[in-house]
Amino acid sequence: MNVLDKYQTFYFAGIGGIGMSNLARYFHASGKNVLGYDKTETKLTKELVAEGISITFEDDIHKNIADLNPDNTLVVYTPAIKNLKILNYFNENNFQILKRAKVLGLITEHTECIAVAGTHGKTTTSTLIAHLCNVAGLPFSCFLGGISENFKSNFLYKGNQYSVVEADEYDRSFLQLSPDWAIITSDDADHLDIYGDAETIRQGFQDFANLIPENRQLFVRKGTHLNRPCMTYAVNSPADFYSDELRIENGKMYFSFHHEGKSTPFSWEIP
């Protein structure tokens, strides 16, 4: 049983964030009561309100908070939100409080999770995978780190068998996930305020890669520093999957795609 199932209400402190809002949309789509706080009204918070999610913009204990029951309410927060009266209230009244990364991890425990990690390219790659899942008619949910041009949202709900998630390396959040398949687009030095140096961030990606079950698959950009079996991809360089002969004509990109000694011509309008 998913431990999240016992909660009927989900309160998001910092609901206007791109990662918090897709979780809020997920629980709302699942029929839960969802409400939250954010400091500033934005286009995204207006969209959430239009979808039926209650949001306040004052750090105060309104009636909708005072009426919540700690036995069936989960409070979700992001470390970006600090020193809130609302969070202090929830702490003092014995509410269960979890970081956003932990909650996403609990969701992935009960789905077949496709996770996209890397210091660059997570949102684009995740959106492409979500598009393919959608076209294939798979029962999936996707949690994106940006607003997808084709979905007009950072979230899409088509079912719960599969999940497509961005595996965020910041604060080692991706180690909370339970990925079945994963792509690592890069392991360049980033977030050195958290990791300290390039070697430590690479170890973080190694720890993430080690979460993939041996009977599932990990795909990595060729040249990524990992010590485990994986399949590689590249552009203009031989790999397990690679493309070459790239050209752009009349707004379309043309290229040859290579795998297992076979070459297939491709074209698409994505830049």
Regions found by a protein language model. Give the residues of each.
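Conserved SAM-binding strand-loop segment of SAM-dependent methyltransferases
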Residues: 54-58
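Phosphate-binding loop of NTP-binding sites
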Residues: 3, 26-29, 49, 62-70, ...
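NAD(P)-binding Rossmann-fold cofactor-contacting core
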Residues: 31-47, 140
